[in-house]
From Swiss-Prot:
InterPro entries per record: Fibroblast_GF_fam, IL1/FGF
Signal peptide coordinates: none
GO terms for biological process, alphabetical: animal organ morphogenesis; cell-cell signaling; fibroblast growth factor receptor signaling pathway; neurogenesis; positive regulation of cell population proliferation; positive regulation of endothelial cell chemotaxis to fibroblast growth factor; positive regulation of MAPK cascade; regulation of cell migration
Organism, as annotated: Homo sapiens
CDD domains: beta-trefoil_FGF16
Location(s) in or outside the cell: Secreted
Residues carrying a glycan: N78
Protein name (record): Fibroblast growth factor 16
Gene: FGF16
Main localization, broad class: secreted
The family this protein is said to belong to: Belongs to the heparin-binding growth factors family.
PANTHER family listed in its UniProt record: FIBROBLAST GROWTH FACTOR
Amino acid sequence: MAEVGGVFASLDWDLHGFSSSLGNVPLADSPGFLNERLGQIEGKLQRGSPTDFAHLKGILRRRQLYCRTGFHLEIFPNGTVHGTRHDHSRFGILEFISLAVGLISIRGVDSGLYLGMNERGELYGSKKLTRECVFREQFEENWYNTYASTLYKHSDSERQYYVALNKDGSPREGYRTKRHQKFTHFLPRPVDPSKLPSMSRDLFHYR
């Protein structure tokens, strides 16, 4: 028990240290620093079970991610990302990991993969927590959130690449997105254990 408690304390310290250290360092100018910190955080997250994560008090949130196009975002074990209209789907239960003020990573509870965006703006599931898996979470005026890549954007206009789902639930490439499009607007919805099938409750450690 003491060892587990030490992991939590260390993780909490690492995340707060990461936040303060990042404060005056532009992400684009510090790839080595950011990669090192993400590796440290990922290692500590992997030591605990999903049940243990409940002790992290706001650092990690378990949510569904609902898009204005009518779909919940899912991360599948084979690394594909898609949307579903099914509420509380197995692969739509996600963990939101707060890395710093306004910076998050998103991981599928069942798949264990992190949401990532590559240089072409394509969404995918990553086994490792890398810079492609860090997004800037912004609260918009219409009460929805947007999630922008911290690594990729249009070189000419500086317009950011956003996480987005099309009207058919397919992922929309980041280079085709704009902040005020409904494709890019999401609501993090809380998970209701009573709506999960019994098998899923055991899988996600809900009793």
